[in-house]
Amino acid sequence: MGRKRKGRDISGWLVVDKPAGLTSTAVVNKVRWAFDAKKAGHAGTLDPEATGVLAVALGEATKTVPFITDAMKAYTFTVTLGAATNTDDAEGEVIATSAERPTDDDIKEALLGFIGEIQQVPPKFSAVKIDGQRAYKLARDGEEVELSARPLWVEELVMLDRPDADHVVLEMTCGKGGYVRSIARDLGEKLGCLGHVRELRRIWSGPFDAEDGVTLEQIDALAKSPEIDQFLRPLEEGLADLPELKCTPQGATRLRNGNPGMVIASDVEYGEEAWASLEGKAVAVGTFKAGELHPSRVFNQD
């Protein structure tokens, strides 16, 4: 019999404004400790030196993590022009330099080529797996890392500022699996001047905004106290991109037991993914078919 997990059965989302210098895992561990939560996870890794939205799910909200991971995200970032690094950010070693510097118009024109569906090769220092091993571990060991290009949807990529000839500030809105470091690297190569990320901030992720985020100082100040629960947001916010269907108490009972349950639907199409609620609380996520929701995930909420 497995060991019983210690902690509170607490569920919800905590939007953390992650500071630079911490891994995403370290932030999740701190949140789990501060809330004395049995279960916690995050919806999308941020590099250690990156800041901004890190959405942490507690308890039953962890079942909604895939919907935030798949959601659109936005970043602001500064690209240093004239140098490439082995990590594609400022933490790595400079491996090549260039004296070329593009004009503002050159940059704006080049950015157009990164909008829409693009093919992107992840950085060699990334968590992508190659034959079961993380790429960054192979790269650290000095092994040659070859990563395949993968599709990425870029909704928007614009220049916000050009503080000097060596730097450009950009904002990007993109879908799942985007590497900002790869954008900086590929933009530098396209402009003929090389480039890498100097600073990176995730300003929103799905329904969660950095400006609404909680700092680690706020978490530390209220850790292990009842007052810390004020920062939690309902797990239902993790389902913001799915249509909501109302269900009856009888339908909710069936859904909680893993069976199809009757729901009230108007604008949902047959076969569409949706979630069912009873008195505002999520009961299940599933597929809508002929007046019923066929559950794929069930929430255990009081």
Swiss-Prot record:
Active site residues per record: D47 (nucleophile)
Broad class of enzyme this protein falls into: isomerase
Keywords, sorted A to Z: Isomerase, tRNA processing
Native source organism of the sequence: Ruegeria sp. (strain TM1040)
Domain of life: Bacteria
Lineage: Bacteria, Pseudomonadati, Pseudomonadota, Alphaproteobacteria, Rhodobacterales
Keyword Isomerase: yes
InterPro entries linked to this entry: PsdUridine_synth_cat_dom_sf, PsdUridine_synth_N, tRNA_psdUridine_synth_TruB, TruB_C
Catalytic activity as recorded in UniProt: uridine(55) in tRNA = pseudouridine(55) in tRNA
E.C. number: 5.4.99.25
Protein name per Swiss-Prot or TrEMBL: tRNA pseudouridine synthase B
Function summary: Responsible for synthesis of pseudouridine from uracil-55 in the psi GC loop of transfer RNAs.
GO terms (BP aspect): mRNA pseudouridine synthesis; tRNA pseudouridine synthesis
Similarity section: Belongs to the pseudouridine synthase TruB family. Type 1 subfamily.
